[in-house]
Amino acid sequence: MKYNLRPDERATLELRGLFEKFGYKKYKISKFEEYSLYATNRNFLIGDKVLTFTDLDGRLLAMKPDVTLSVINNTGATREKSEKLYYIENVYRENRENHCFKEINQMGLEYMGRIDRYSILEVLSLIHI
């Protein structure tokens, strides 16, 4: 059976295959994070607006404006133990043209933990393919 994929879907499938060939594992995280993660790391974010809400337990949560901070917050990587992860996630950012939030599909990879020259070259080669 042959499927007609859009160019973005085809690119996503090809990148997934490439990342997995190099040992990267798919990382899936919740749509929500504690707002404090983003408030503490505001300088890391692209914009200064974060879509928030209070959950049923009274905690202030945020719709992810960024994936990297969530991965860092939830990974088991240490200076001795590296993790090679990739993600395909939706993030929520301010649309400055109409002052609304927009949902953006984002794909990326993270090499976390012990970093050496090989790991740097690996990531650079993967993003330049």
Model-derived regions: residue spans:
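TRNA-recognition modules of translation machinery and tRNA-sensing kinases, especially anticodon-binding
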Residues: 1-127
